[in-house]
A protein has these predicted regions:
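N-terminal secretory signal peptides that target proteins for export/translocation
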Residues: 1-23
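Surface-exposed, short loops/turns at beta-strand junctions within beta-sandwich domains
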Residues: 105-113, 210-216
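Aromatic (Trp/Tyr) and acidic
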Residues: 43-79, 91-100, 143-146, 150-224, ...
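Long, well-ordered core segments of solenoidal/helical folds
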Residues: 236-261, 360-378, 438-452, 471-494, ...
Length: 707
């Protein structure tokens, strides 16, 4: 490669020649590393699993990514109790670093029988035990089903990699749910056929878990096939899920230390606090900061994704948190999620326990950055950006300069309602802070002027009326209220739309639950109808797929197949208003999807589950992985759908949409995330499904003896 590049440089490209000269040692190091890895490749047979009653899975892990590293060319080299297997297929995919699932067609397995499997890479003797041998075909929530829901289930689907999907032959098997600690049977049943599912490509069967009581951990044992990963219901299992998900926002904070005793010691000082006044055009990674521009200091807000820009789209985070608090105030308290809330003037951590619910503290963190972004005339910058991207390390070591983007009326428009909302909710705790935020809101609304979005105009009017009692604002609410019906058409759209004409329930929900101001019953009914319409629409989408993905086939944006929090939100709000069981059932089912109840049996949220994401496209996770800690917890990656690159057998391009995924760091359509698309709604929904409460992260419910 060096020779080819050198020839290319000789053809009149001196800059490239200089680049190659500088990078030559790096290229040599890369080649040496590759050859070293190849020479020290370690392929390990980690586990014998099943996929069916007559299909064993030899599950290998490797520290190198070579698709054909496991030798499957010679059928005779694979023998079970001395007899060659009947057929071989495989699923190879990137993980840590590569997983090889080798599917072996064998005689029907007999429970309690000892077998010896010989492979080209060694042999293993094992006993097939349907209560202990893991069956890949059982797909369940690996973290915690909500005890609030009366509809809980796992799916069963046989998929053999490049051998494709398979139906169950003969009678459908029975199953039982057992307690992991003592093997006691908790529930029984028989698989029910759901049918062929186009979204996953699977033949799907249902395992009803509705009779399983709160507690765990449990396992599902399917007669003749094997067992599931452990799972729990409610209690500490659900609280743990809510805790990890909510704290993803703390981990994503900009300008805030992320350190013990609140998290791993990722950075002990605030990051990206100096902002250069560039006022450059909106665009990802294209803003040039010379370092000669005027500067100011800013705190608050969030890193966008695997990189560190801050954008107007992020306003949906505090907005959603505030609405969730209003819908479920009894579920949120101070010191609930172990996040710092006391700081010195330079935002070094002083402690926690300020008497304000953590969910409002987090909403304030997301809000206050935009105060710094507001000019004295009320206009608000779109955000901060830079040229290129920060290095893959802790942001404490990031010397990248970030500058302001242009003043944009959409930013002022969105911020006006957000500021007013925060002013109202913080008033009981800090009246002076409330007054400051109200001034920011009024200035932003005036600056947006005729460019204010209708969605944001209603939001501002609702919050202003509820805060101040202003009758002109109330009249504006009445005049605009019919427009809220648009929520059912935009609630599941790409979240960028919420900075424009897309509707969030937050823009009008406060009026429904208002207690301190008179409200117009007709307007309340209109707003309630908008919530119900969106919830009913989502329930229809949920019923349209065998897995609870919750999307129609034609819905596609980055992360749309793991955005169940966004889809569940109208159902959750409808349940808060009516307590009708079907709505919390729907919300709960949707939120099971990313925890493992999906075709790949993958938990798409880092730090949770048994089949985990290893390679999120996240700069600080690169640092935490080098420390041996794993990725930062709570990151919900974009997941399946779309296109990308990476090693996979079979090739993902030919698979159904819910199987198009490779855990490849460079494939950002699969492995990246954003704070506003991926983390916002789950951080609000999972704590509600866990019924609030405080989780002690020193005690993992999966590792503790259960009564």
């Amino acid at each position: 490669m060096l020779r080819i590049l050198s020839v290319h440089c000789e053809r009149g490209e001196p800059k490239l020649a200089q680049f190659i000269h500088r990078m030559k040692p790096v290229f040599i190091s890369v080649f040496c590393l590759w050859f070293s890895l190849a020479a020290n490749a370690e392929l390990t047979l980690k586990e014998i699993r099943t996929a069916s009653k007559d299909v064993l899975v030899a599950y290998f892990q490797s520290n190198v990514i070579i698709s054909n590293e496991v030798n499957t060319a010679e059928l005779a080299a694979w023998r079970l109790n001395g007899q060659p297997v009947k057929a071989i297929s495989k699923f190879v995919t990137e993980a840590d670093a590569c997983d090889h699932h080798i599917y072996l067609q064998v005689p029907v397995l007999v429970n309690g029988t000892s077998y010896t499997l010989r492979t080209p890479h060694g042999e293993r003797t094992f006993v097939f035990n349907e209560e202990r041998t893991f069956c890949e075909s059982i797909k369940s929530n690996q973290s915690g089903y909500s005890a609030l829901s009366r509809v809980r289930y796992a799916n069963f689907a046989i998929w053999l990699g490049d051998g494709g999907s398979r139906q169950i032959s003969g009678d459908l098997p029975s199953y039982k749910v057992i307690k992991q600690a003592d093997g006691k049977t908790i529930a029984r049943g028989k698989l029910q056929s759901i049918g062929e599912d186009a979204s996953s490509g699977d033949f799907v069967y249902r395992i009803d878990l509705s009779a399983v009581p709160e507690g765990g951990p449990y396992k599902i044992a399917v007669q003749g096939y094997g067992c599931s990963h452990p799972f729990g219901v409610g209690a500490e299992f659900s609280r743990r899920l809510g805790f990890v998900s909510f704290r993803s926002l703390y981990h994503q904070r900009c300008g805030c230390p992320i350190a013990e005793p609140y998290a791993w010691n990722i950075k002990t000082n605030p990051c990206h606090t100096t902002v250069w006044q560039v006022n450059g055009p909106i665009g990802e990674a294209r803003l040039i900061v010379t370092g000669n521009e005027p500067t100011f200091t800013a705190f608050g807000g969030y890193h966008d994704a695997g990189d560190a820009d801050r954008r107007t789209y992020h306003m949906d985070v505090p907005v959603t948190l505030m609405t969730t608090y209003e819908a479920f105030p009894q579920m949120f308290t101070d010191d609930q999620f172990n996040i710092p809330d006391k700081f010195d003037e330079n935002y070094h951590i002083v402690g926690k326990g300020n008497g304000i619910p953590d969910i409002l503290d987090e909403a304030m963190w997301g809000t206050m950055f935009w105060e710094y972004m507001q000019e004295t005339n009320g206009q608000v910058h779109w955000g901060t950006e830079t040229k290129g991207y920060s290095p893959f390390t802790t942001y404490e070591k990031d010397s990248t300069r970030f500058g302001t983007e242009v003043l944009d009326p959409r930013s002022a428009s969105f911020a006006s309602g957000m500021f007013m909302h925060m002013a109202r909710l913080i008033k009981p705790y800090n009246a002076a802070r409330s007054q400051e935020l109200q001034k920011h809101a009024e200035a932003a609304f005036a600056a947006a002027g005729g460019d204010v979005r209708l969605t944001h105009k209603l939001y501002f009017a609702v919050e202003k009326y509820l805060l101040t009692g202003d009758e002109a604002a109330h009249q504006l609410v009445k005049d605009l209220s019919t427009n809220a019906s648009g929520y059912a058409n935009t609630y599941n759209g790409a979240p960028e739309s919420f900075a424009g004409n897309g509707w969030l329930a937050s823009y009008f929900f406060s009026y429904i639950v208002a207690r301190d101001r008179p409200t117009d019953p007709l307007v309340v009914d209109r707003f309630k109808a908008a919530i119900r319409a969106a919830a009913e629409k989502e329930i229809e989408y949920l019923a349209g797929n065998a897995y609870p993905v919750g999307t129609p086939p034609n819905l596609r944006w980055w992360g749309s197949n793991t955005a169940q929090g966004q889809y569940a939100y109208p159902c959750l709000l409808q349940w808060s208003l009516t307590r009708e069981q079907k709505y919390i059932d729907a919300a709960s089912q949707l939120m099971d999807y990313v925890q493992g109840l999906n075709p790949l049996g993958k938990c798409y949220m880092t730090g949770l589950g048994f089949n985990r994401v290893h390679n999120p496209h996240d700069r600080e996770s690169a640092y935490t992985k080098r420390q041996g800690w794993g990725p930062r917890p709570g990151i919900l990656v974009f997941g399946p759908g779309g296109t990308g690159r990476g090693v996979s057998i079979p090739a993902v391009g030919g698979l159904a949409r819910e199987r198009k995924y490779i855990d490849n760091l460079g494939s950002i359509q699969w492995s990246e995330f954003t704070v506003y698309q991926s983390l916002c709604f789950p951080s609000a929904v999972y704590p509600v499904l866990g019924q609030g409460g405080k989780y002690d992260d020193a005690h993992d419910p999966f590792s503790m003896p259960q009564k």
